[in-house]
């Protein structure tokens, strides 16, 4: 656990942000700047990813969730707002399942409740095969291009390149296995937190059915759609994304 990088910035009520597959703490850089004016913002890099690339990766969502819970305990954070993106959205759903009382408001961004991700631009098994055949950097680059409307020409694509620079083959495969084997749809009815669901309408990883399922099954939830954005809406329309989150959190 000691090699897990966690950035903590700002003061006030804690807000924990959990990145997705091939992500890092720094993928939230455009959120940290804004949110830290109102909150204590905690952004870990998951084991094997980003700044935690030296830490052994995990191959299941539950262990990733337990890792985030442990980080909050180590930093004496007993209750917090929680946001997860993509695979991070699976992790935060699992955190709510394990320890519902520690989570205040919940934000599910570009994510779903079925780990195999029906409607994804390619099945997870295909990504695993391509990872084996093409290697980690080539696969990460190919996948990350789908996260932006403008592909690798997007202004903030470089953040993805930085994030996957040191990720190894094992971590790449572990993440895909973790997602494929996870399922949270049956637990949605038990989520009592006030929940904001954010989705870019051009997302190629998660289609509308996935976020609609979240919205219909989480009783106290609302869905906000950011038009003209893909999977990484927080890096494409930063202002609209940040405003949605701050308004939801009452700032």
Residue ranges with predicted function:
Residues 4-54:
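Conserved HGGG/HGGXW glycine-rich cap/lid loop of the alpha/beta-hydrolase fold
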Residues 33, 42-83, 243:
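Active-site loop/oxyanion-hole signature of alpha/beta-hydrolase fold enzymes
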Residues 84, 88, 92:
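Gly/Ala-rich beta-loop-alpha elbow adjacent to hydrolase catalytic centers
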Residues 93-98, 103-133, 138:
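Flexible "cap/lid" loop of the alpha/beta hydrolase fold
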Residues 116-122, 133-189:
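Conserved alpha/beta-hydrolase catalytic His-Asp/Glu region
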Residues 191, 197-199, 203:
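Short beta-strand/loop motif that positions the catalytic acidic residue
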Residues 208, 212-232:
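Catalytic histidine neighborhood in serine/cysteine hydrolases
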Residues 229-238, 242:
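Catalytic histidine-centered segment of alpha/beta-hydrolase-like enzymes
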């Amino acid at each position: 656990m000691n090699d897990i990088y966690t950035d903590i910035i700002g003061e006030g009520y804690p807000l924990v942000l959990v990145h997705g597959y091939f992500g890092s703490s720094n993928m939230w850089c455009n959120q940290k700047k804004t949110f830290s004016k109102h909150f204590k913002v905690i952004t870990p890099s998951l084991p094997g990813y980003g700044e935690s690339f030296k830490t052994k990766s995990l191959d299941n969502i539950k262990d990733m969730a337990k890792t985030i819970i442990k980080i909050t305990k180590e930093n004496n954070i007993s209750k917090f707002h929680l946001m997860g993106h993509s695979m991070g959205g699976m992790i935060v759903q699992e955190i709510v399942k394990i320890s519902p009382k520690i989570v205040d408001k919940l934000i599910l961004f570009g994510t779903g409740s079925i780990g195999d991700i029906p409607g994804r631009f390619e099945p997870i098994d295909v990504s695993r095969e391509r990872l084996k055949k093409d290697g980690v950097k080539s696969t990460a680059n190919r996948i990350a291009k789908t996260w932006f409307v403008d592909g690798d020409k997007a202004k903030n694509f470089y953040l993805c390149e930085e994030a996957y620079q040191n990720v190894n083959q094992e971590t790449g495969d572990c993440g895909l296995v973790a997602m494929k084997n996870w399922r949270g749809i049956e637990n949605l009815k038990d989520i009592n937190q006030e929940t904001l669901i954010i989705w870019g309408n051009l997302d190629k990883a998660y289609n509308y059915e996935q976020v609609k399922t979240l919205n219909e099954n989480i009783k106290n939830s609302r869905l906000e759609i950011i038009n003209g954005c893909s999977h990484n809406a927080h890096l494409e329309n930063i202002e609209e994304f940040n405003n949605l989150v701050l308004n939801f959190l009452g700032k």
